Design a protein with these regions (language model features):
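A short glycine-rich beta-alpha junction/loop motif
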Residues: 112-119, 151-180, 184
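Sequence-specific dsDNA recognition surfaces
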Residues: 25-45, 57-89
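Non-catalytic DNA-recognition/assembly elements of restriction-modification systems
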Residues: 1-40, 165-209
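Short, positively charged
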Residues: 130-162
């Protein structure tokens, strides 16, 4: 378990007088969303360049935003006409198949599309803070809920109709913002330090040559 997940798993008493998992009302996640971007069901026609089309391998619980590994591409026309909807900045990518439950934030600007095996969750800001929801979805408790509802012996699959079984603790808004912002900032710093170290390593290798 990496440092970020340790933090999430133990945040219940982080400078607070209560535990969100024990002392807060729990609400089905579907009641906390304003929209779900779902383009699953058809195979997207691809091209040699253009808009990035990311797959589930691009979404991990170890990075704040999706990574662009083995991406495919599609034309502007396909982008404008094929999809039901597109992710917006601040949405949360949620993997349904393969390794269900992996989540990443959607960056600003958005330079990719999603189709098979994942959806994007749009938090209802009147009900829940999106960064808090993101942090909670990565928590040990919610990841276990997702694992317990997976179906499929060969390829695990979290069905969309199971979404209302994910119960999210909903504390006061100020607490949501405290947890969400802290987790987001921690994730950002970890990711930034990783990139700095990778860059230093590349420079060191170049000097040796």
């Amino acid at each position: 378990m990496n440092s970020k997940m340790k933090f999430v798993g133990n945040w219940g008493r982080l400078g607070m007088k209560f535990n969100i998992w024990e002392d807060c009302p729990k609400v089905p996640i579907t009641e906390l969303l304003s929209f779900i971007v779902d383009n699953r069901g058809k195979t997207v026609p691809t091209a040699n360049d253009g808009w990035k089309l990311i797959a589930t391998n691009c979404v991990t619980n170890n990075t704040l935003f999706p990574v662009y590994e083995k991406v495919r591409y599609l034309t502007q026309e396909t982008y404008e006409t094929w999809f039901r909807a597109h992710p917006m900045p601040g949405d949360i990518l949620f993997v349904n198949k393969g390794t269900p439950g992996r989540v990443c934030m959607v960056p600003d600007p958005v330079d990719f599309c999603i189709a098979q095996d994942m959806i994007a969750l749009r938090a209802d800001d009147k009900k829940i803070y999106n960064k808090y929801l993101f942090a909670v979805l990565r928590s040990r408790e919610i990841q276990q809920q997702i694992y317990n509802t997976n179906v499929g012996d060969v390829i695990p699959h979290f069905k969309k109709q199971f979404m209302d079984q994910l119960l999210i603790p909903v504390p006061d808004r100020k607490i949501q913002e405290k947890i969400g912002n802290l987790y987001y900032q921690l994730s950002y710093k970890v990711e930034l330090n990783k990139k700095i170290n990778e860059n230093l390593y590349v420079q060191a290798q170049a000097i040796k040559k």
